[in-house]
């Protein structure tokens, strides 16, 4: 009997996504990472951060069900945070 294929893109399947978050000056003091962890079923892990009065740049890992991670990203973008996927892992070297 052939094995049944399981799709890795199911909404509830677990995923980990590493992202760059870029905050404009007016949003730097907002606790977005805390809010994401409270509003969505995701675990946040700050991998790297640089925050000044002019800009905030954060490398953030989000772990959780795929649909929750997508919703968290959409919520961040809706609230004015620029979200980009990390293309290469320069953090580990």
Where do the PLM segments sit?
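Long, contiguous binding/interaction regions
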Residues: 1-56, 61-93
